[in-house]
Amino acid sequence: VDIITMGCSKNLVDSELLMKQFEANGYHCVHDSKKPNGEIVVINTCGFIESAKEESINTILEFAQAKEEGRLKQLYVMGCLSQRYQKELEQEIPQVDKFYGKFNYKNLLKDLGKGVIASCNGTRSITTPRHYAYLKISEGCDRSCAYCAIPLITGKHVSRPKEELL
């Protein structure tokens, strides 16, 4: 499984959590290979700023073309872009096997005939250099700024309990 991460460090943490679940289910994972050849590719998209949307769409199109050419078997898209524009993406890029919203890894695993490994919940396969890793302490936003799409994409602000963080 190749997991491609677009956008912010929160997406990277989501991808690392997904990688751990795939590995616990017996899959070999590669992160950000950017080479469209393999069995399964999952693209974790960004839909916040215009340049990130374009990069996400271009990446999806590149891998959709690779799927058409037979260089990969299954293509899945998740993350902010597919959360916000799922219907439009489904219509425009039918090569994608399925679009999932913002980090809906449980349904992705289920659709692949696998389950969530409870002992791995909250643990992840770190992809950053050994001297640091990102810590995702919250998700969403409670503000409704006219220029910002984060509340629309990620929902209301939710903090992780401090017991999980410490």
Regions found by a protein language model. Give the residues of each.
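Proteins enriched for Cys/Gly/acidic motifs involved in redox and nucleic-acid/cofactor modification
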Residues: 1-166
